[in-house]
Amino acid sequence: SHYSEGPGQNLPFSVQNKXRLLGMM
């Protein structure tokens, strides 16, 4: 199930996480 998403979804997710951290700061 999760493998279906692939690393492609992980990449954007990481970027969003970084932006979230920056926004919080």
UniProtKB/Swiss-Prot annotation:
GO terms for biological process: mitochondrial electron transport, cytochrome c to oxygen. GO terms for cellular component: mitochondrial inner membrane; respiratory chain complex IV. Keywords: Membrane, Mitochondrion, Mitochondrion inner membrane, Oxidoreductase. Pathway: Energy metabolism; oxidative phosphorylation. Residues 1-25 are annotated as: Disordered. It comes from the Eukaryota. The keyword Lyase does not apply. It is found in: Mitochondrion inner membrane. Pfam families: COX7C. GO terms for molecular function: oxidoreductase activity. Belongs to the cytochrome c oxidase VIIc family. Component of the cytochrome c oxidase (complex IV, CIV), a multisubunit enzyme composed of 14 subunits. The complex is composed of a catalytic core of 3 subunits MT-CO1, MT-CO2 and MT-CO3, encoded in the mitochondrial DNA, and 11 supernumerary subunits COX4I, COX5A, COX5B, COX6A, COX6B, COX6C, COX7A, COX7B, COX7C, COX8 and NDUFA4, which are encoded in the nuclear genome. Component of the cytochrome c oxidase, the last enzyme in the mitochondrial electron transport chain which drives oxidative phosphorylation. The respiratory chain contains 3 multisubunit complexes succinate dehydrogenase (complex II, CII), ubiquinol-cytochrome c oxidoreductase (cytochrome b-c1 complex, complex III, CIII) and cytochrome c oxidase (complex IV, CIV), that cooperate to transfer electrons derived from NADH and succinate to molecular oxygen, creating an electrochemical gradient over the inner membrane that drives transmembrane transport and the ATP synthase. This is Cytochrome c oxidase polypeptide VIIc. The lineage of its organism: Eukaryota, Metazoa, Chordata, Craniata, Vertebrata.
